[in-house]
Amino acid sequence: MRGRDEETGEFRGASRSQQRREALEIFDLGEKLVALTPAQLAKLPVPESLIPHIEESKRITSHIAHKRQLAFLAKHMRREDEQTLAAIRDALDANSDTARREVAAIHRVERWRERLLAEGDVALAELLEAYPAADRQQLRQLVRNAIHERAKNKPPRAYRELFQVLRDLSQEQGLESGDSELEDGESASEDDE
């Protein structure tokens, strides 16, 4: 409770600045919830009482009205207990971490594809050394076809297929960890020079 302590004369509770920071934090959390798709929202531990307010905020397109509705959503969120809000924050953080890891894995596969197209057999040999179960002939043919398609300005069918094969290989054999090892080895050899 806010106010002065009668015995000590000190202020009790959070300061106005602290209350504003907490209110803005809940407002930001509400914005994140509104930005989610219905499928993503269903995975979160959001109380049923907040769902209509979130849906209403999504429906409103006028800037000022949308902001007013977000403030109304934040007001209802402040009525929820701190454990509920903490559970929502934790779930959102876990979702963003998972999404970041997935994006990083895709970027690693794309780097492998670009290395295969740029360096050819050298990169292919490194890939096959790390992952002997990979089909050398299929990879070599896809690299050759992708280079040919790029030179002739054709649709990138083999380029996409090469990505699919590398992604499947990464999921089956853990290309992500092998790729980071190879990149670490490359940077170490470059540092030695």
UniProtKB/Swiss-Prot annotation:
It is found in: Cytoplasm. Pfam families: DarP (PF04751). CDD domains: YjgA-like. Residues 1-20, 171-193 are annotated as: Disordered. Keywords: Cytoplasm, Ribosome biogenesis, RNA-binding, rRNA-binding. Residues 178-193 have a biased composition (Acidic residues). Residues 1-10 have a biased composition (Basic and acidic residues). Signal peptide: none annotated. It comes from the Bacteria. GO terms for molecular function: ribosome binding; rRNA binding. GO terms for cellular component: cytosol. GO terms for biological process: assembly of large subunit precursor of preribosome. NCBIfam families: PRK05255.1-1. Member of a network of 50S ribosomal subunit biogenesis factors which assembles along the 30S-50S interface, preventing incorrect 23S rRNA structures from forming. Promotes peptidyl transferase center (PTC) maturation. Belongs to the DarP family. This is Dual-action ribosomal maturation protein DarP. It comes from Xanthomonas axonopodis pv. citri (strain 306).
